[in-house]
């Protein structure tokens, strides 16, 4: 059975007080193929645009994206494809102030999902070396 996820729950789709609000909201949820996201926002205040790439999402780079912007609340986005999906508000500086959501969509019959990666993992950090356990003395 599919689930409708109300983005931001009672907060809705708005410029959050914390830039991590939407990533924290998504962290505790499993998004499956066939589910939907519902974005609720005041008329003319916000919009919803699905970004093509993580790079565009991270940079809030939505040049030439006017064609695909949904402006009438509530916006329902059906999750039909596996993998990462990136949603932003293209109004003013809303995206750069944290009004953006990335989610990982898993198969409808998946039993366990991994949490999505953090929005900006460090690229130059090496994992710590694996040390053998001390030998018993």
From Swiss-Prot:
4-hydroxyproline modified-residue sites: 115-117, 121-122, 127-129, 133-134, 136
Residue numbers binding Cu cation: 46, 89, 94, 99
Residue numbers carrying Pyrrolidone carboxylic acid: 1
GO MF annotation list: electron transfer activity; metal ion binding
Biased composition, class Pro residues, residue ranges: 114-137
Gene3D superfamilies membership: Cupredoxins - blue copper proteins
Keyword field: Copper, Disulfide bond, Electron transport, Glycoprotein, Hydroxylation, Metal-binding, Pyrrolidone carboxylic acid, Transport
Ranges where the record places region Disordered: 112-137
Domain Phytocyanin: 3-107
CDD domains named in the record: Stellacyanin
Superkingdom, taxonomy of origin: Eukaryota
InterPro entries: BlueCu_1_BS, Cupredoxin, Phytocyanin-like, Phytocyanin_dom
Keyword flag Transport: yes
Known glycosylation sites: 109
Cysteine disulfide partners in this protein: 60-95
Protein name (record): Cucumber peeling cupredoxin
Species: Cucumis sativus (Cucumber)
């Amino acid at each position: 059975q599919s689930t409708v996820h109300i983005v931001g729950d009672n907060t809705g789709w708005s410029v959050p007080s914390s830039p991590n609000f939407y990533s924290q909201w998504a962290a505790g949820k499993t998004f499956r193929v066939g589910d939907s996201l519902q974005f609720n926002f005041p008329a003319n205040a916000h919009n919803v645009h699905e970004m093509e790439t993580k790079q565009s999402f991270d940079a809030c780079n939505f040049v030439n994206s006017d064609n695909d912007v949904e402006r009438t609340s509530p916006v329902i986005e059906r999750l039909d494809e596996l993998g990462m999906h990136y949603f932003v508000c293209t109004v003013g500086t809303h995206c750069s102030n944290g009004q953006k959501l990335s989610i990982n969509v898993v198969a409808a019959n998946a039993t366990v999902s991994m949490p999505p990666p953090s929005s900006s993992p460090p690229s130059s950090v090496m994992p710590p070396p694996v040390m053998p356990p001390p030998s018993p003395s």
